[in-house]
Amino acid sequence: MPFTVAIIGRPNVGKSTLFNRLVGKRLAIVHDLPGVTRDRREGRASLLGMEFQVVDTAGFEDDGGDSIEARMRHQTDMAVAEADVALLLIDSRAGVTPLDRHFADHLRRLPTPVILVANKCEGKAGAPGLYESYGLGMGEPVAVSAEHGEGMYELFEALRDHAIKAGALTPEGDDPEPEEPAEGEDGEPDPTRPLTMAIVGRPNVGKSTLGNQLLGQDRLLTGPEAGLTRDAIAVEWEHRGRRMKLVDTAGLRKKAQIYDAIEKLSVGNTIETIRMSEVVVLVMDAAAILDKQDLTIARLVVEEGRALVLAINKWDVVDDPQTALKRLKDRLETSLPQARGVATVTLSALTGRGIEKLMDAVLDTWTKWNRRIPTAQLNRWLEDMIERHPPPALPGGRRYKIRYMTQAKARPPTFVLFATRPEQLPESYSRYLVNGLREAFDLPGVPVRLYVRGGKNPYAEKDG
């Protein structure tokens, strides 16, 4: 039986969101109403190369009768009994509730190990609930944001010993070495799997017109009225022999501009589409390049770890192209430095000019998003970076020691830096390394993630 992890907790703490994050596709219905997930859902999950079975359970309800809540609780108890480890989720924004306390007490009496996970920890709003959760007596909580993908490395760390005990990881391999590339993850086109490409942007910027140009047919509804495309529409086609899947979505507007319930659902579907895509093309109107809402969408794409390409539509009517491009680059530099160097293509969706350049940019960005760097090459680069600019000294004048770096995964490129006292490495030095990775290994415009943790250099031990 594979290593099995059960996700448990009271209703509406984000269990299905975490399940979807780990499984990598939307198998569980996500809604902000308690009790949406009434049955157990199972899927194969992957976390930094660790493979396991994950179970999304119904929310615990404090009800001992034969109500549906009682049956949901019975299903959850069964899932916990069959799991190697359980993740008890709480909502750090809501704080610890009496139900959280009740079921923490209940789980303590069961033999299955329990890891406390404080969800919705993005930003400052979740901090009080995170600190309060220590009072549950379940050990140190793992702070995550299932919605934004934050804290996944820390979750890996918490699960690692349990995975070793279950035989899912070997003790020698418990530090996350670069995982073997799955088919299609090494930057080479995989003819058996389409590249998923989403077209997103504000309403009425020409997303569906662009989609129709790519497909060569009027497959997507177009018109001057904003909001014509309510649902995300997926269409497969071939480009130069490469299978592609195009997803055209409803436009993302500012929240204050979203009035009806159907459009709210469409915006939610767009956000989900971004998460499930590989390359996201953000379409902008040349008359209003990179306004506040464009930046919000671009940040969302980067936070979700997707590959980003910018497409400036209606370029054929721009009076001063050079000034417009400079304004765009300056705004990116100041407002979205993590997307510095992102591929930017000017085009006309109506006439088709620039479409081939757009597809070149999509394929090139996808290749970089899949890039893997050999550990030896990575550490030669790291030595050079440290020699050029050593990390600042620790309090008392002690030298900060960086041991080595490894790439944990691609899609997006994710690196782990092993060092003494990882919590004391300044954020500015992490940025220095991330910028260096982008420049040295040709990763402009691709999300690059760097985690810092303590640990010995296994390569030094092997040499000895």
Curated annotation (Swiss-Prot):
The keyword Hydrolase does not apply. SUPFAM superfamilies: P-loop containing nucleoside triphosphate hydrolases. Residues 3-167, 195-370 form the EngA-type G domain. GTP 1 binds at residues 9-16, 56-60, 119-122. Belongs to the TRAFAC class TrmE-Era-EngA-EngB-Septin-like GTPase superfamily. EngA (Der) GTPase family. Gene3D superfamilies: 3.30.300.20, P-loop containing nucleotide triphosphate hydrolases. The gene is der. It holds the Pfam family KH_dom-like. GO terms for molecular function: GTP binding. GO terms for biological process: ribosome biogenesis. This is GTPase Der. HAMAP family: GTPase_Der (MF_00195). Residues 172-189 have a biased composition (Acidic residues). NCBIfam families: GTPase_EngA (TIGR03594), small_GTP (TIGR00231). Residues 168-193 are annotated as: Disordered. Keywords: GTP-binding, Nucleotide-binding, Repeat, Ribosome biogenesis. GTP 2 binds at residues 201-208, 248-252, 313-316. Associates with the 50S ribosomal subunit. GTPase that plays an essential role in the late steps of ribosome biogenesis.
